[in-house]
Structure formats: C-alpha cells, structure tokens
Amino acid sequence: MTKLKKVMISVIAATLLLLAGCGSSAVIKTDAGSVTQDELYEAMKTTYGNEVVQQLTFKKILEDKYTVTEKEVNAEYKKYEEQYGDSFESTLSSNNLTKTSFKENLEYNLLVQKATEANMDVSESKLKAYYKTWEPDITVRHILVDDEATAKEIQTKLKNGEKFTDLAKEYSTDTATSTNGGLLDPFGPGEMDETFEKAAYALENKDDVSGIVKSTYGYHLIQLVKKTEKGTYAKEKANVKAAYIKSQLTSENMTAALKKELKAANIDIKDSDLKDAFADYTSTSSTSSTTTSN
C-alpha cells in the first residue's frame, strides 16, 4: 500500500505537535534516568522534522482554501477496502495504523489533489487534444502467474471449459484480485503496464480471453468484462475531463501546485533547525506543465 508510509508521517506529525513545548515532564522512567518530552520531541524532530513540518504546514494552508468532505474521504477509503479485501485490516494493523489515522492521510492527499486541480489548465483546447487519444475505461479480469508454463496450463483448462473466475482464485498470484475472480477496477489509457493495457484493449467481445501476455509483473491471461464504445466529444466531455485531470495528478504537478500555495501563504519559519524544510518547494529550478486556466 503506497500511502501507508505517508500515514505514519501523519501520526508522527500529530505526536510532534503535542510534544512541542511540553517541557521536562518524563514520558519514560527507568532506574538509569528518564526520557523527557523535550528529549523525545528533539529526537523525533531530528529524524522526521522536515517531512512532518511540511505536512502540518501544507495541511493548514490547504484547509484554509479547499474543502474535503467526509463523503469524499469515505469513498477513497472504500477503494482500498475493496482493493485489499480481507487483508485490509491486517495490512493496516501490521503498519501500526488505524482506520482513523489512515483516513486522516487520505484527507490530506485529497487536499493536495484539489490544490493541483485548481492550478490546472482544463481549457477546451486542452480537453479536445486529450480526447483524440482518450479511450473509455475498460473492465477486465486477469490471472497473473510467475512462469509461462503455468499460463499455458491455465490456457488449456480454459479451452476445456473451466471458468476463468475459478482459475483466477486457484492460480493467480495477484492476491488483491484473486479472491474476486481476478476482477480489476476499471482503468483507462496510461494507467496500466503498457503491454497489459494494449492486450486488454485489443479484446472486442465480453468474455473474450487474450493470449498469454508478458508484463513486468509476470504472465497474464486477460478476460474482457466490459468495453464501451467511444462517443463524440460532446457526449464524452465529462469523462474526458475527469480522465485528463487524473492524468495530470503527477508528482511534478502536485509539487508545482504546493509551491504556489506556499508562496501565497507567506511562510515564516521560526525554528532554525527547520530552516531548510521547504527547500524543495521554494527553489525555482524545477518547472511544471501545470498552469492556471484563469
């Protein structure tokens, strides 16, 4: 789960905020001496300082301009529940996370996304250009295995009438989808491994199965679940816009948006130990394609 590390930073940030300025009260006592709140704060600041102060500061800045609703957070949370299935709670637990702490980080990520969207050029010309190569989302099942021999074995079983969903549960090494018969979330161009995506979009009719597809993850067999014909620009504009925005939520564009928000906030760092915390966001060396359409 790519966002779990960021959630840990959220938890640490909250702890640092509570410890700041707390003084000499002991948090741990031993016969050899005590660990004070000040000592803990300084140690955590040294280890996590820059990341923590960045997230705390950006959260404060973004909350003043953008709103993330509980409904939006819950919808994002549900995606992870569905993706990880029965292993979701154990995955959170193994990373010392709770439902609440994970949702807090999802809220922060959504704030960053909204700031990035606000700085995008979503003009008609941009959308029409994007529409030329855009395709509607496609839904497929897949079976992922480590070697071609196993993939051929599955192919034979499919030809003999065995169900794709049953074979996915039995063979697929993709634990996030195997229990659900290999079903993947709908995806569009540029969202998957290029070879996998090309093979998926080449399927024409429901339940068609691809040949063996080699990707960076292993060997796949892909079954088409749903494929929608591409409509006119006027008909598809809302879908095109959503896909375009999603394609522009890159690290580069998010950083550019945060730079702009930080500059507008007139930040003043009081703690000299954290003077370089925002160096990556105040430099002018990097550029981005993200621009405001206003």
From Swiss-Prot:
It comes from the Bacteria. One of its GO terms (biological process) is protein folding. PANTHER family: FOLDASE PROTEIN PRSA (PTHR47245:SF1), PEPTIDYLPROLYL ISOMERASE (PTHR47245). GO terms for molecular function: peptidyl-prolyl cis-trans isomerase activity. The keyword Signal applies. It is an enzyme of class 5 (isomerase). It is a lipid-anchor. Residues 1-21 form the signal peptide. Residues 135-226 form the PpiC domain. PROSITE patterns: PPIC_PPIASE_2, PROKAR_LIPOPROTEIN. A lipid is attached at residue 22 (N-palmitoyl cysteine). GO terms for cellular component: plasma membrane. It is found in: Cell membrane. A lipid is attached at residue 22 (S-diacylglycerol cysteine). It catalyses: [protein]-peptidylproline (omega=180) = [protein]-peptidylproline (omega=0). Belongs to the PrsA family. The keyword Signal applies. Its EC number is 5.2.1.8. Plays a major role in protein secretion by helping the post-translocational extracellular folding of several secreted proteins. Its main location: membrane. Keywords: Cell membrane, Isomerase, Lipoprotein, Membrane, Palmitate, Rotamase, Signal. This is Foldase protein PrsA 1. InterPro entries: Foldase_PrsA, PPIase_dom_sf, PPIase_PpiC, PrsA_foldase, Trigger_fact/SurA_dom_sf.
